[in-house]
Amino acid sequence: LNYEDNTFRYRQDSTFLYYFGLSCAGLSAIIDIDEDKEIIFGDELSIDAIVWMGSQPTLHEKCERVGVKNLMPSAEITSYLHKCVQKGKAVHYLPPYRPEHKLKLMDWLGIPPTHQEGSVPFIRAVIAQRNYKSAEEIVEIEKACDVTADMHITAMKVLRPGMYEYEVVAEMNRVAESNNCQLSFATIA
């Protein structure tokens, strides 16, 4: 996390993935109801990224796969939003978590970070939609619960007098990783 390309190992919020079906860092999106279009703002991979990760589908191809026809470079979101504001359009957004996102919102909409509370009607609409779970989502939730239970049971089984906490945590992490799961936060030991 000491380098821009070392992204976090987890998503703090899956709203972007939920609505746009893409799990890629550095993307922004707008659902423009007035224009009846969805736009993803992002940039194609740099040559450095391609050398590091190998050949990848282009961002354009990824957008096509999820049914988004409009892709614009990241730099164009500012002018797009400024035009919306100039036309008097309401711009709804969810409350930002990360400080860099608060700075982006300030640049895009002119709203200081201390006043970025998000749109309550939009927040309520997202909550209402996210309350309904598909069969696939329920399977993943149940898997997460099962793995978490296995982690705790493993900790209880391996725990011995004189063990260090890091040894117990290592066993818990082994259970998670052997199930192809990553922790959303460090184990509290």
Identify the meaning behind each predicted range:
Residues 1-150:
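A composition/biophysics-driven feature that prefers long, compositionally simple stretches
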Residues 1-2, 142-189:
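Active-site cores enriched in adjacent His and Asp/Glu residues with nearby glycine-rich loops
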